[in-house]
Amino acid sequence: MKIVEVKHPLVKHKLGLMRAHDISTKRFRELASEVGSLLTYVATADMETEKVTIEGWCGPVEIDQIKGKKITVVPILRAGLGMMDGVLENLPSARISVVGVYRDENTLTPVPYFHKLVSSIDERMALVVDPMLATGGSMIATIDLLKKAGCPCIKVLVLVAAPEGIAALEKAHPDVELYTAAIDKGLNEKGYIMPGLGDAGDKIFGTK
């Protein structure tokens, strides 16, 4: 599995700000979107382009254009919504597919409860976005669903990943690509990433 820890200074700076215990909902939400945008820039660097001719101000001009059906953005509900605006800044025409998975707090196992995928998923690259890759269960369940629907290419964008989640994802889906702003130390006894960001969903939505 291709694993990319994006070490750009802007990414590291913004992620560092997100780790503050007293960060406001507004600021956390802004930074999640900004880091999501930067991760998207890196993750799409290998997209194929094709030459097309358009009418420019001085006559015909040849330009590069993204080839094919392009992309669907797949936020995992609910926390993935916090990164979606940043992704769409770079890909404003991307179609959106939504997957709902929550983690049972007692067993730490993923529980899928909703999905709505674009009809042309079998012709698109999927960018799956979720702030945290902890145990990997929710991400694996989402990718299982995408592959079952025929999605040919899947890339994962997360703010923070734990080694345990990376190992689980690589074992289940070695063909996907992972882009993360940080690989942290590991999980605590409750399955939270340490030092991590805390509960990203609660911080994005202001529910705690």
Swiss-Prot record:
Gene name as annotated: upp
Family the entry assigns: Belongs to the UPRTase family.
Cofactor note: Binds 1 Mg(2+) ion per subunit. The magnesium is bound as Mg-PRPP.
GO molecular function terms noted in the UniProt entry: GTP binding; magnesium ion binding; uracil phosphoribosyltransferase activity
Pfam families found in the cross-reference section: UPRTase
InterPro entries (alphabetical): PRibTrfase_dom (IPR000836), PRTase-like (IPR029057), Upp_B (IPR034332), UPRTase/APRTase (IPR050054), Ura_phspho_trans (IPR005765)
GO biological process, one term: uracil salvage
Catalysed transformations (reactions): UMP + diphosphate = 5-phospho-alpha-D-ribose 1-diphosphate + uracil
UniProt xrefs under HAMAP family: Upp_B
Cited function: Catalyzes the conversion of uracil and 5-phospho-alpha-D-ribose 1-diphosphate (PRPP) to UMP and diphosphate.
PANTHER family associated with the record: ADENINE PHOSPHORIBOSYLTRANSFERASE, URACIL PHOSPHORIBOSYLTRANSFERASE, CHLOROPLASTIC
Entry's EC annotation: 2.4.2.9
Residues binding uracil, per UniProt: 193, 198-200
Residues forming coiled coils: none
Essential cofactor(s): Mg(2+)
Keywords, sorted A to Z: Allosteric enzyme, Glycosyltransferase, GTP-binding, Magnesium, Nucleotide-binding, Transferase
List of residues binding 5-phospho-alpha-D-ribose 1-diphosphate: 78, 103, 130-138, 199
Pathway: Pyrimidine metabolism; UMP biosynthesis via salvage pathway; UMP from uracil: step 1/1
Activity regulation details: Allosterically activated by GTP.
Protein name: Uracil phosphoribosyltransferase
Domain of life: Bacteria
Gene3D superfamilies, per database record: 3.40.50.2020
